[in-house]
Amino acid sequence: MKNGKIGVTTENIFPVIKKFLYSDHEIFLRELISNAVDATQKLKTLSSIGEMKGELGDLTIHVAVDKEAKTLTVTDRGVGMTAEEVDKYINQIAFSGAEEFMEKYKNQSIIGHFGLGFYSSFMVADKVEIFTKSYKKEAKTVHWSCTGTPEFEMEETDAEHDRGTTIVLHLSEDSLEYAESSKVEELL
């Protein structure tokens, strides 16, 4: 188990993100789906150049809502992340993992950047959890959670999780419409 603080330049970054950075509250879903598409594209790229061994399998991105649990979940079977990558790309706000990847694989088309966009989730969620497992051999599942403060919890676990990333948004009381299938379908 690792506890730590998310690296930010100001203690008040989350209220800024929640209230001012994104005037369109529905951007969070586009950002999460864009990140899932990026992760899937990266996996395809790595597979095509022989750096990822094994079957790609079903690369469909899934969005699910649970009205009772008040959650919205986005799941992909892309590259996933190791604990070190979560530390680097999630815990250091605004650093984009896509930049490094694009530099290494310049000729490939990669959209979006995993950075601040992920944090738009806190506009609608009181708590965000990530369950992720890298495509890399011997990778462990990483569980990360944050309640919208600069503090997070992260641990590697032996829990079964397919390659890829699942992001669970525990919706805030004023955003429960995103636990409605009809609302999410409208946005997609």
Question: Which residue ranges define each predicted feature?
Answer:
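GHKL (Bergerat-fold) ATPase N-terminal catalytic module, capturing the glycine-rich phosphate-binding loop
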Residues: 1-178, 186
